[in-house]
Design a protein with these regions (language model features):
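Outer-membrane beta-barrel translocator/receptor signature
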Residues: 26, 38-121
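Outer-membrane beta-barrel porins/channels
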Residues: 2-30, 91-241
């Protein structure tokens, strides 16, 4: 078993910016990342800036989240049972929300947006009938990578009129992702000399986007409550360089 501070350990993070984290604070993550319409004076809503207008006067909401995961895999290879375990532990979100004026609130959050973490190994066995590998022998391929993308958001929410709120936020994304590939040949016949092939990719991400959101309390009384919400991100894709 291994332990790491990265937030992912999956071969699927070999592509793009990796595995996207479930957004939101604990109440929203426990519902699978939904909560655009959630409006509460006691919960920081990171999914919709319009919810910042729900901050009660003379209050300060602070949220700090931690996340830990355990990955375990067991399989049979060539009749032999092999297993691996990996533990991850890191912070998930730091956020706060406070009122600026009556029906006007401000929110801030710092959250991991996506994570990359993998190491896979593949061996191409010796095949004497192959015209190429019959001379080279066995070759081992190792692919590995790690990194993450972090999101910081600052927004305001304003209740324009009764039961209808509008919010806008600025989002900044940054991070580094490193990937490498190594091919190591092992001659079987002892003839010839072969060197390893190494390839590396280093990506840096720095991008600014925006978000606009609305919330409407369609029904709000002592017996029932129905809130409709929507949020839209604008500003393009996260393109690594």
């Amino acid at each position: 078993a291994q332990t790491s501070s990265i937030n992912a350990f999956s071969p699927y993070t070999m592509y793009g910016i990796g595995e996207q984290n479930t957004p939101g604070t604990l109440p929203m993550r426990s519902m699978g990342g939904v909560g655009v319409a959630m409006r509460s004076s006691g919960v920081v809503n990171l999914l919709n800036p319009a919810a910042f207008s729900a901050a009660p006067q003379k209050s300060f909401l602070f949220n700090f989240g931690l996340e830990g995961q355990n990955y375990y895999n067991s399989q049979k290879v060539d009749g032999m049972s092999k297993s691996t375990a990996y533990n991850t532990f890191n912070f998930h979100d730091i956020a706060f929300q406070l009122p600026l004026a009556k029906k006007l609130g401000l929110g801030f959050s710092l959250t991991p947006y996506s994570s990359v973490g993998y190491r896979t190994k593949y061996t191409h066995d010796y095949d004497p009938s192959d015209p190429v590998w019959g001379n080279v022998g066995r070759a081992q391929y190792v692919y590995q990578g790690e990194g993450d993308v972090t999101e910081v958001k600052l927004g305001v929410g304003w209740e324009l009129f009764k039961n209808f709120s509008l919010g806008i936020a600025a989002q900044y994304y940054w991070g580094d992702i490193d990937r490498s590939f190594v091919m190591t040949p092992t001659p079987i016949t002892g003839d010839g000399s072969y060197s390893s092939t190494v390839g590396t990719d280093n990506y840096s991400i720095s991008s600014i986007k925006g978000q606009i959101g609305v919330q409407w309390n369609a029904i709000l009384n002592q017996k029932r409550a129905l809130t409709l919400g929507a949020a839209y991100d604008f500003g393009g894709d996260l393109n690594p360089t």
